[in-house]
């Protein structure tokens, strides 16, 4: 079975950190991108943090979003353009 390439937005938040912890234990998932609005040049699980962008999401099959409502709309615009699936966990809409 092929692995699911996963991008996690808001990766430094409580839910983002939990998603990373769970994903690295799951053999069916490969984290290909971690995004955060701040703390660039930081590395988590061997992956450098990026800002939300086409480059960050290009290799992902699925984007899991745990950011803010404003940021979620940004993620959705990029995901739509790239035809990526998105799981939204953001609250506060």
Region roles according to the model:
Residues 46-60:
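Short acidic low-complexity segments
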Residues 2-6:
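Extreme N-terminal starter segment of soluble prokaryotic enzymes
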Residues 16, 41-45, 59:
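A glycine-biased structural micro-motif
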Residues 22-45:
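NAD(P)-binding Rossmann-fold cofactor-contacting core
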